[in-house]
Amino acid sequence: MSNFLNKYKSVYDVFLDNWSYQSHFVLYLEALMRQQTLLPTYIKEMIFAYISGLNGCQYCKNIHAEISKKLLRDANEEDPLLDIENAGIEEKYKPILKLAHKVNADIKSIADEDVDQVLQYGFDEQVISEIISICGAAQFMNTV
């Protein structure tokens, strides 16, 4: 009889058991979320939390939302991920969260206008691949 379910209680057990190749993904996640890139870390955490919420992974949503709040030093208990349009975040980040939603729901639904709404705030086009990468990482982690 397999002891699989007892052995793998969390994603971390899976990573540790297969560290020779899983370590690369862990390092990728660390670089993606923590290295200075086009997006501030709190927005990357917010994207991760938003996608996790859309995917029904409350564990990841709650953790990444709290990290984002702490990075913002925001004492506001309101959840900006519930209503992006009226969220108390800078306007330039709202199109990024909207684009992240489309990446998660149906990447083929993304139109030039969606990208233009992000780029109009002076972001480099590389920010689009960064958004897609964060969404992909969240999707993977939400299903492991």
Task: Locate predicted features.
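Helix-adjacent hinge/juxtasegments
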Residues: 59-62, 66-93
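Mobile cap/lid helix-loop segments that border enzyme active or cofactor-binding sites
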Residues: 1-45, 66-69, 76
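Alpha-helical scaffold segments that form or flank carboxylate-/histidine-based iron centers
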Residues: 7-14, 41-56, 85, 125-132
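Preference for long, well-ordered alpha-helical segments
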Residues: 127-144
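Acidic interhelical loop/turn segments
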Residues: 109-131
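Short acidic alpha-helix initiation/capping motifs at coil-to-helix transition points
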Residues: 20-27, 58-60, 104-113
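Amphipathic, charged-and-aliphatic alpha-helical interface segments
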Residues: 49, 91-110, 132-135
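Short, thiol/selenol-centered motifs that function as redox-active sites or metal-ligating centers
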Residues: 47-71, 134-138
